[in-house]
Amino acid sequence: MGRGRVELKRIENKINRQVTFAKRRNGLLKKAYELSVLCDAEVALIIFSNRGKLYEFCSSSSMLKTLERYQKCNYGAPETNISTREALEISSQQEYLKLKARYEALQRSQRNLLGEDLGPLNSKELESLERQLDMSLKQIRSTRTQLMLDQLQDLQRKEHALNEANRTLKQRLMEGSTLNLQWQQNAQDVGYGRQATQTQGDGFFHPLECEPTLQIGYQNDPITVGGAGPSVNNYMAGWLP
């Protein structure tokens, strides 16, 4: 008995679905390559995974040239009478598809750089992604280092300016202290000069001591009051030669 027809439907198991996709994709790419080699045919194959991952094969040197050839054959046949408006619409649609594919590719690349959707990637693609991350890290470190150096130079310039301002203030304080000392010294010198002038003036003028009795030729000796008789004798003796 032969095998019955297998119903084609979506594989529910995620792991089995990814494994089946990888096997069928590789087989399809292999068949396209064999067809191009064996039959000398120009073959172009484009596959998008359910996560938006692009897989392609082109037997010619450029996928874009093959697509342009396809577009010319499909939309630009001589027997087809296409108006200018329709041609513009087709051109706009083609440009939109290109931009959409580019946008989706950038989104996939961004998710891969963030560590997402890495399951469909093979070893070469992972190595390429790793190199991109290494280059990004080097650029980030270089930018951060340059930023730190610029900040350090700015701080050094500010430090130099503050040191100059501090040196100027110290110099002004020293000049002010010197002037203050000179002023105090001058004030002391002026005070000493006034005292010396007063002392010299006092030497010219002596106070007169008023004696109650004018005694000519009498030496002013202390008188000891002992009695009436000695006092008179002493007084008279002062007048005798």
UniProtKB/Swiss-Prot annotation:
InterPro entries: MADS-box/MEF2_TF, MEF2-like_N, TF_Kbox, TF_MADSbox, TF_MADSbox_sf
MADS-box domain residues: 3-57
Cited CDD domains: MADS_MEF2_like (cd00265)
GO biological process, one term: positive regulation of transcription by RNA polymerase II
Keyword set includes Transcription: yes
K-box domain sequence ranges: 89-179
Keywords: DNA-binding, Nucleus, Transcription, Transcription regulation
Major location category of this protein: nucleus
GO cellular-component term (any): nucleus
A molecular function GO annotation: RNA polymerase II transcription regulatory region sequence-specific DNA binding
Record's function text: Probable transcription factor.
Record's protein name: Agamous-like MADS-box protein AGL9 homolog
Gene: FBP2
